[in-house]
Amino acid sequence: MEGRQEDQMNRQEEVEQSNNYDRSVDHARTGRSSWIDNSEINSKWIPQHSLQLEMNNIEGEGSVRENDEEEEEIVVLDPEHPLMKRFQTALKNNFTNQLERLNLDLCEKVVVEKAEAQRRHDLAEEVYMVQEMLARLQASLEVCQETNSEAAAQHRQAEDHLYVVKNQYQDTASQTNVQRLQVLELQSKVDNLALKLLYMQEAKSDLCSDIKAIINASNKAQKERTQTEEQKHQQDIYVERLTNRVEKLLEQISLYDLQLISQTEQTRAAKDSLSEAQLELDSVIVEHRQLLQQWKSSLLMMKRRDEAYTAMQEELRQANDQMLSLDTEIESYKKSITQEEEQNECLTLRLNRGQTDCTTSRKLITHSQNLQEVLQAQLSTYTRILQETENTLSTLHGNLEMHQSALKALRKQMEKVSAVRLDLESQIMNKLQEQLTHNNAAKYSRRMNDKTAVYRREKEAQLIKFENDFNTVTLEGQELATHLDSLLAFQAELEQKSTQRHLLLSSREEEIVKQITDIERKQATISIYNKKIKDIVSSTGHEDLGPLEIHAATLSKELEEVGAKIKECQQLWLWQQGELVRFTQEKQAHSSSVQILQTQLTILQQGKIRRESEMEQDQSELADLDKQIKVLMADMVKLNSLLNKNSDLNHALQQSSNLMETEFRQRLKEAEKDSAETQLKLERLNEEKERLINSLVEAERQVMLWGKRTQLMQETCSAIDSDIGQGDIRTMRAEIHRMEVRYAQLMKQQERLLRDMESVVAKSKTIAVWSEAQARTQAHKQPTHNDYHNTIQSLRRKILQTKKQTEECDGVIAQLEERLGSMTSRLQDKQMHLNNIQNTEAFLSQDLRRLQEIKERNLYRLPVLQTRAKHLHAVKEGRYTPMATGVTALELGTHKQEERLKMVSLTLQRLAQEYPQHHSTLHRMNSILAEHLHGECPNSQ
């Protein structure tokens, strides 16, 4: 029974102890939530016990209060306690081993730091050299920028000077055009006056020749008056025949007068010749009156009329020839128009080809622009990546600031590396800014090159236009020269013919003079013989025909025959004189045309000289522009080389910075891993240490509690009588026995806890050794100086490979640039060809417009001429009634009409200025009115 009771009591105590243990565990969980995981892990090795005893309910409230006070007390063992010596010796050995290991690690780290400091010094020297090179490049770039700015200023000055020269050229061109128009007007006036003067001189010469002929005829008539009286009977019949012939000639003259009037109304030259013919007809009428008195003079005048008639027929023939030549010219114009249309079709085909080439070039340009956009997108992605890297670097800076307390040495190194990185970033930013400035300068130079190319194309187009004008002028000059040669040949032929005619006339005149002298001599002999006959007749009183009389009769007959021959020769001489006059007139006309052509040729030669001077000026300007372009191209080549060098340096710096960043990041990650592992190990060791100390303190407290309780029990036993409370004594003995058993258990537990503490120290030592071994393995894995050297060698190999790749890329870029240059040259050639085609098209369109204007002008003049012909026909038939009678009324009417036409032309000019969209039609109408005004002015005169 007692054994069962003791067992039940032991069970109750164990249950209470387990409940108290659970309460202490809950209190530890609520108090130290951060050590839960480590306590759960370390609970496998370190068992935690908390002993707490309670007195029986029999003992009273005082013993319960004492037990509560004992439970609330926390006993802490002194370090010099004999129980702590074993633990302290183990900890001391552990700490000494750790100190030795840390000293060894510190020596190794000092050596590594020295090597790192040497490497940093070398890297700082390299960075200093790179900075010096960058400064030199910056200075050269500033010099290039200054040269570019100077070149741009010179280019602007050249453009301003060119603009001023263009304005001056336009002003001078407008002035020259106005002066040319004035010269042409004055030349036309001078030509008209010269023609009038020639006509007047010809009329004067004709009148002088007529007067001389009349004087000679009157003298001859006075000499032959005596002879005519004797031969009056024979010539009355001849006079009647002549009167009939004169009447016929008068009828013919009236017909010729009508024809002459119609011809004079058709052309201005015909009008002048008609006025002369009318004057000659008046003189013919006067001479006809004289012919009624003097038949010989009338005969001569009729011969002259015949000559005038032949001259008019010749002029009519010439007019017909001119009409035929105009028809041939019209046909040639039609053929040329068809040829121009074919040429225009060919040009349109070429233009379409050029447009297709332009479309292909535009497609290529769009493709290059797309490539540029893709490259810009890549650049934006690279910038975004750089920003992300900067963000990551900022985050790393934050992490580094968080771990500054634990990693001071790494923090210093990191600060140095970050300073280097900041310097590199500033250098990279400076390089990027320099690259942007280079790009802007390159864009500006490209823009200036494009402007110069456009200006050069314009100048080339102007030069081609000048060459075309020069070629046209040379062709016109050659045509004029050929025409002049033909005219000179024709003039030489005419001169030869005139000389032949003059020789014939001189020979005939000599023969006539000889015959006249013979006739006069014979007449003198006849008169002598007649006197002798008269003397004989007067002496004898009758006529006797002797041989001499018969011979005289025969001689008189011969004289009559000779007189008839003389008359025929005189008629032939007169006809030859008319031919000579006609030839002289043709010669004068040819000489006037030759003079006009010579003046035109001189004008064209002056224009040629002026255009050659302009072309030389343009060529000199083009040479200057070529020189400037070459200088700019050399500057561009230098800038491109500098840009390539800067890009290579930037690329190398970026690669080195990227490599340093990657290495630094790897080292940071490894250091962070090491620091995290060491922190975890330290936290675990601290937790284990605290738990062990707590368990030791609690065990010591339990031992002290049990000592106090045993002392109390002994005192109670001594105080209690032997007689009183034997049952209680038994229970107390049982309790004491239980306490002794419990004490033995606690001593065992204390021994076990001490062993656990020693094992914890040993385990911490093994953990430290294991962590050191792992750190050493990781340290072995980390790169040494040889590894760095190997990595540098591999990086150098990679750099060489990248340099080779960049050289290959440069070669490809050079090939592409050559292809681009060839494409640009081809585009420029095609552009020049297209400009030539456009210039020829514009020139042909101007010619076509001019021909259309001439056609419209002719179509406008045709009904006017038709109405004029109708009016002339009405005048011929006598049905025309004039609007104004008298010179003053006619002048007033013409003046009014001219004023009306001037008002209409002014209104048309104003409308053309107000409505430029209808400028062509209004200008055409205005030109027709101007021609009408210019045509009416000489007619009115």
Curated annotation (Swiss-Prot):
Lineage: superkingdom: Eukaryota
Tissues in which the protein is found: Expressed in tissues that contain motile cilia, including Kupffer's vesicle, the floorplate, the pronephric tubules and the otic vesicle.
Region ranges (Disordered): 1-31
GO cellular component terms, semicolon-separated: cilium; cytoplasm; extracellular region
UniProt-annotated location(s): Cytoplasm; Cell projection, Cilium
InterPro entries reported for this sequence: CCDC40
Basic and acidic residues biased stretches: 1-14
Traits of the deletion mutant: Defects are the cause of the lok phenotype, a phenotype related to primary ciliary dyskinesia (PCD). PCD is characterized by curly-tail down phenotype, laterality defects and pronephric cysts, but without defects in sensory cilia and without the presence of hydrocephalus.
General function of this protein: Required for assembly of dynein regulatory complex (DRC) and inner dynein arm (IDA) complexes, which are responsible for ciliary beat regulation, thereby playing a central role in motility in cilia and flagella. Probably acts together with ccdc39 to form a molecular ruler that determines the 96 nanometer (nm) repeat length and arrangements of components in cilia and flagella.
Similarity section: Belongs to the CCDC40 family.
Name this protein carries in UniProt: Coiled-coil domain-containing protein 40
Gene: ccdc40
